[in-house]
Each structure stands twice: as C-alpha cells, then as structure tokens.
C-alpha cells in the first residue's frame, strides 16, 4: 500500500483537518517535476552533441547532484520565530532556486511551513489539555486513596489533630517506586523498624481530602431527572461502603482507559505527521535534485512535535498507576484493558453469511414457484390467509429489510470513514460489522421463509389437516425464539450489542426522564419507520391471545381494546421523539429542537387522523387526514434534507454543503429526490390508491418496506452530517464522567 493511502487510513477521522496535507504537497511536487521536464527538453540535443567532449573531460563541470558535492552545502535555511500567541512558527528560505519550477518550489515550502505550524500548534494545544486532565485525574486518585483507606479501616477513628501512621502496603506496592501516592505529591515517610522498607504516611493529611468532595451521580435515573427539574442537589453524601468503593473504582478505571486512549492517539498523531514530512521531503530531494530533507528534518526533530516527551511520560504514569490500582499488579491484564481491542474478521462469519444469503434467495424462488404452481392466490380461503397469516409473517420481512439496510449503512460508513462506533458510543471492539448484521438478518430470513413454505405446504396437503393448529403456531414459535435470543442473559449471540439495544429501547420508552443522546433519538427515528411492524406485534397478541388462531379468523378489528391500541402503538415512536425534543429544548435551550418537536407533533396528529379514517370512511376524516399528512410530509422532508443532512445551504457550492464525504455529487441529488418520492408514498393510504392485482395487506406491506428503505438512505447522510460536525470541532473522544466532585473554593483555600 502506498504511503498516501496508508496515511489517510491511519488518521483519526475527527482530526483529519489537523494532519499534514500530504496529498496537497504531493500535487505541488508534481508541478515542480512537470516544470523541470519542460525546461530540460530544449537541452536534450545539446547534451547529446557534447557527450564525447564530456567524456574527454574538456567540458567537465560539477553539478549539484554529483558525487563530489560538498556535504556542508545546504539548499535551505529554516528560521524559527515565536508568535504573539507564544507558539513557534517556522519559515524556510531556499538559498538557490532554479528558474524552472521556481514558483512551485517557493509555494511548496510555504505550504509545508504552514502545514507544519498547524500540526505543531495542534499537537501542543492537545498536550496541554492532556496535562491539565492529568492534574484532574491526580485529584480523583487522591480522593480514591482516601476513600479506600476509610473503607479498608472503618473501625479506626482519625482526627486532624492526630498523627497516626498507616502501613500503605495494604493498598500500594513496594515493588513499584513510582507509586500513585508519590506521583500526586503525597508525603511518604519510612519509619518502620525495617530500615524504612515499609511505606508509611500521615493519614490525617490524606483523609482531609474527603472533607472537600462529593460523589457525582454518573448514571442518570428518572429520580435524578426529577431532582434536576426541582433544582435539588444531584450529588450524594459520602458513604464509605465497599459497594461504593467498587463503583468508584470501576468509574475511574473507565476514565483511565479513555485517557490512555487519548494519549495513544496523540502519540500516533505525532509519529504519522513526522513520517509524512520525512516522506514528502525525500520526494522533494529526488524531484528537485537537492539535499533539503536533512536540514528540514533536523528542524522537525528540535520542534515541540518530536522533542516533547510529555505524552510518553504520561503514558508510563498511567500504565504504572492502572496496573497497580486497577489490575491487581498484573501488568498483562492491565495492558490488555488499556490497549485498544483489534477486532478480527473471522472467515466463518463470511462463510455463514454467504450460506444464509444463498438459502434466502433459494427459498424466495421456491416460494414464488410454489405459489404459482399451486395457484394459491386463486384458491379458496386465500383472502382469509392474507388477513391473518400474512401480517404475522410480514413482521419478519420488515425486520430483515431494516437489518439489511443497516448493514449497508455500516459498509458505506466504513468505506467513507464515518466513525460510527464513536458516534453511537459502542464499547471499543464490540461494534457489529456489516457481515455480522447480514448474518443475523439472512439467518432470520431463512428461518421465516422455511416456516412460510412449511405452512403453505401443510395448508395444501389434505393429509396434514390434523396438524392445522401446529401450522398456525409456526410464526409464534419463531417470534418466541427471536425474543428469547434478544433477552438471553448468556454471553452468546453478540450479548453486548443486545444489551446496548435493549438499554436504548428502554431510554426511548422512558423519554423524557433520561438525557437524550444520539443513539436514543436515532433508534426512536428508526422505530417511526417500523409502525407497521409494531402493529403486527399488536396483531400477534390479539390473534394468539384471544384464540383466533384455532379457527383462523380475525376478530381483532371488532374489539374496542384492539382499536384503541391500534392508535397508541402507531403513535408511540413519534411521541417518544416529541418528548426527546422537548427535553433537549429545555436542557440545551436550542430553539431548533422546538421546531423539531412541532414536526413530530404534526405527525402524531396525522397518524391519528389517518387511523381514524381507516376505521370511519368519511369525507371529513379524509380531508383532515389528507391536510395534516401533507403538512407533516412537507415539513418532514424539508427537515430531513436541510437539518438532518445539512444540505441545500445557499452559501455552499452546488447547493449542498461545504464538505462532502461521497466524491460524486450526483449521489446527494439522487438521495434528495428519492427522499421526496418515498415521503410522498406515505400519503398513499389517505388517497386510497389501490392496485387491482394486489391485496390490501400486500399494498400496506410494500409501502412499509418503502419507508424502511427511505430510512436506510436517511441513516447514511444523517451520520455523515454528524461525523462532519465532529470533524469541525475535532471531537474524537467521548466524555467520561468523574466519580468525585471537588469543592473548588475549599480546595483553593487548602
């Protein structure tokens, strides 16, 4: 792989603007090379004619590239100056510039200096942030040590007037002299009988920290939300229990893991940019026939980017502290927790995915041929089948289609370097790849299609009439299996992803009692495109709960309870998004969230009116449903394109946005048109547009499938826009809450 591609591949996506513009510098070098080739062409004949004289030595000259060149001669000088902001800036002067490519060479070094200044400035600012964060972590660990002493020795009573020594060997290791207590400036004395071998410390000084701290509630609950609304304190009094100690240690462990991850990213940032400068200077020397790489790299080696060892020191301190206090002095265990987990692609996943794809395609073909050969659509009872069994099996079709769209999203997010694991907040190394999602989707598809074929075959075979009840229960068995896998407590079938999904679903249901994060409103938006699937779930409860499956009859529509929940189930996803927007409006004071809430409120009204029209076919209901559906559709379409995707901005080029990840602009225009067309398809149920050769349930399923496809398209551009926002703010790390809150005033006084 060429360095340019490898350089881009190893970049931190959110920091890509802060890296060296290697491609831009390379393009300038190509201009220099082109200029030099042009200048050499008129001299080709002259060089040929003078070849024999050169050989005789009569016209011998010493070129700059000759082997006899003096090593002391330099082609460039690099000057370092300090700007008003205190940061160093570098300026390169070319001592001798050839006429050919003069402008390009000057432009090359000017661009190179600007790029290096940018990298150096960014690196220094980030290192300063890390140093400040390390100070905060020192305070947190100071509090942890005091808290641990209090928990480990609850029977002892310490007062500030006493001077008591405690053997710190119970908490810290004597083998590692660079202990946490020493790093944080705690005075440690050796006054044991073993010549100072025992580490002892004045405990009241350490415990005095506890007077200035409170416990932060890092996990939000409905109770904490209510306290915030009532403006009550959301901090806990210190309770010195082993349970609290375990929670604090777990929180600080996560803080250290994230902090170490930042340090690794910064170290990699420094290395990659230094390597990029070295590579581009070697290319310059080769093209321009100069020796500028050595003096320039000497300057780079003296700069803050490569000479600073703050990051290495911090990494060593974090490793030592983490291994000692969070890994039980087991270095291999501690480093395994600190280092990023590389997810390995397994061949059996690819094989299994391909196997189930083949099974699904084969079963679809077999189903079509079976329906055609047995003339099922013209058979007696096919209408009853479409009104009972079809909605049951269509649930799996909706889920499988949505998973396929999500797998496609993951593929294209990875291709265009959208950092979706960071955006969604997945635990490192646990995110599902597109192959895993396809495996699950086609596995479920294969299972559902097998059930459909078995059902139809037994339906048409007179010898299996005694097993009709079992035939009717097939979809229920599949649904029960899916639910059992989803809630399975064992570490199988991607347990971390299942737990994450269920937690986000619960937060969506409990809105607005939880702070709204991107996974919360993203999943709620997915559910708005699965209204028909939710109604199918309601039909499962009605069909099997009330015993209709025994006689294959649908009495659900005649039930007032079913009709009421038919409204409620369709409204739940939109209402959840409405409450999430209200929460963000109050919490963030962002007026755009108010307009977004209005969009979902309009949709709630439209869905209710459309549902009422499906029960009561009257002109008033039809007109009301049509008006509100049209308003919701136009409002939603505008919001999708302008706010969610960030497109159609007038100042931007081509009416899109300033930055686009997909190089082909036509993709964005096609996506806009598709979004509008598929949004309009939502109006069909109000317009009573039906096709004579399609059953009503089939039409509903097709429209629901189109909405799922629209949502899949929306997903890619929504996350692309979110990723570009992170890139603009250089936001590459998640914020991990700290367990302790310091009283700053008391801290300053002390």
Swiss-Prot record:
Cell location: Cell membrane
Keywords, alphabetical: Cell membrane, Membrane, Phosphate transport, Transmembrane, Transmembrane helix, Transport
GO cellular component, one term: plasma membrane
GO biological process, alphabetically ordered: phosphate ion transport
Tissue specificity statement from the Swiss-Prot or TrEMBL entry: Expressed in root tips, vascular cylinders of roots and filaments, leaf hydathodes, stem, receptacle and stigma apex.
Key word Transmembrane present: yes
Membrane-spanning parts: 351-371, 392-412, 436-456, 473-493, 623-643, 667-687
Official protein name in the record: Phosphate transporter PHO1 homolog 7
Source organism per UniProt: Arabidopsis thaliana (Mouse-ear cress)
Lineage, opening ranks: Eukaryota, Viridiplantae, Streptophyta, Embryophyta, Tracheophyta
Encoding gene, per UniProt annotation: PHO1-H7
């Amino acid at each position: 792989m060429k360095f340019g591609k490898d350089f881009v591949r190893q970049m931190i996506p959110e920091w890509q603007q802060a890296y060296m513009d290697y491609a831009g510098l390379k393009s300038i070098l190509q201009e220099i090379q082109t200029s030099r080739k042009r200048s050499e062409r008129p001299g080709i004949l002259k060089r040929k004619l003078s070849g024999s004289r050169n050989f005789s030595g009569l016209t011998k000259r010493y070129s700059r590239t000759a082997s006899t060149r003096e090593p002391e001669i330099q082609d460039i000088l690099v000057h370092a100056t300090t700007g008003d902001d205190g940061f160093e800036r570098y300026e390169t002067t070319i001592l001798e510039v050839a006429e050919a490519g003069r402008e390009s060479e000057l432009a090359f070094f000017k661009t190179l200096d600007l790029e290096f200044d940018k990298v150096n400035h960014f690196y220094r600012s980030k290192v300063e942030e890390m140093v400040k964060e390390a100070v905060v972590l020192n305070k947190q660990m100071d509090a942890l040590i005091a808290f641990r002493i209090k928990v480990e020795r609850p029977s002892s009573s310490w007062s500030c007037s006493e001077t008591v020594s405690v053997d710190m060997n119970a908490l810290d290791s004597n083998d590692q002299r660079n202990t946490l207590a020493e790093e944080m400036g705690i005075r440690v004395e050796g006054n044991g009988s073993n010549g100072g071998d025992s580490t002892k410390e004045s405990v009241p000084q350490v415990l005095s920290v506890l007077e200035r701290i409170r416990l932060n509630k890092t996990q939000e609950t409905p109770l904490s939300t209510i306290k915030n609304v009532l403006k009550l304190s959301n901090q806990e009094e210190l309770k010195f229990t082993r349970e609290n100690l375990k929670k604090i240690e777990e929180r600080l462990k996560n803080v250290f893991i994230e902090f170490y991850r930042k340090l690794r990213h910064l170290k990699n940032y420094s290395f990659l940019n230094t390597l990029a400068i070295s590579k581009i200077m070697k290319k310059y020397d080769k093209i321009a026939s100069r020796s500028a790489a050595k003096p320039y790299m000497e300057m780079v080696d003296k700069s803050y980017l490569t000479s600073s060892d703050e990051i290495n020191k911090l990494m060593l301190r974090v490793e030592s502290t983490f291994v000692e206090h969070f890994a039980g002095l087991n270095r291999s265990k501690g480093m395994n927790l600190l280092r990023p987990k590389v997810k390995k692609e397994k061949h059996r996943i690819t094989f299994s995915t391909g196997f189930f794809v083949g099974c699904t395609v084969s079963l679809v073909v077999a189903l079509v041929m079976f329906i055609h050969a047995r003339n099922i659509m013209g058979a007696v009872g096919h209408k009853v089948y479409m009104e009972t069994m079809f909605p049951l099996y269509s649930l799996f079709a909706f889920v499988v289609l949505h998973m396929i769209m999500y797998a496609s999203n993951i593929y294209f997010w990875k291709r265009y370097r959208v950092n979706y694991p960071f955006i969604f907040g997945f635990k490192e190394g646990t995110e599902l790849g597109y192959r895993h999602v396809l495996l699950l989707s086609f596995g479920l598809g294969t299972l559902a299609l097998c059930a459909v074929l078995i059902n139809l075959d037994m339906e048409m075979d007179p010898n299996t009439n005694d097993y009709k009840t079992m035939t009717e229960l097939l979809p229920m068995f599949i649904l029960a299996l899916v639910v059992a896998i989803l809630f399975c407590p064992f570490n199988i079938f991607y347990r971390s992803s299942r737990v994450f999904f269920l937690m986000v679903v619960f937060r969506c249901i409990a809105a607005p009692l939880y702070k709204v994060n991107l996974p919360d409103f993203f999943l709620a938006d997915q559910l708005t495109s699965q209204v028909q699937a939710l109604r199918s779930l309601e039909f499962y409860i009605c069909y099997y709960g009330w015993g209709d499956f025994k006689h294959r009859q649908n009495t659900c529509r005649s039930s007032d309870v079913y009709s009421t929940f038919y409204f409620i189930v369709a409204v739940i996803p939109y209402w959840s998004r409405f409450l999430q927007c209200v929460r963000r409006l109050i919490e963030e004071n962002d007026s755009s969230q108010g307009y977004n809430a209005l969009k979902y409120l309009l949709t709630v009204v439209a869905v209710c009116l459309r549902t009422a029209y499906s029960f009561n076919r009257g002109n008033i209901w039809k007109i009301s449903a049509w008006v509100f559906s049209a308003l919701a559709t136009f409002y939603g379409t505008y919001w999708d394109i302008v706010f969610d995707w960030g497109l159609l901005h007038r100042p931007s080029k081509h009416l899109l946005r300033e930055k686009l990840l997909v190089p082909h602009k036509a993709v964005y225009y096609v996506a806009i048109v598709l979004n509008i067309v598929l949004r309009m398809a939502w109006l069909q149920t109000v317009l009573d547009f039906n096709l004579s050769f399609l059953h009503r349930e089939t039409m509903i399923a097709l429209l629901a499938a189109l909405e799922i496809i629209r949502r899949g398209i929306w997903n890619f551009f929504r996350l692309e826009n979110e990723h570009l926002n992170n890139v603009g703010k250089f936001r590459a790390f998640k914020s991990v809450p700290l367990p302790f809150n310091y009283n700053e005033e008391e801290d300053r006084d002390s």
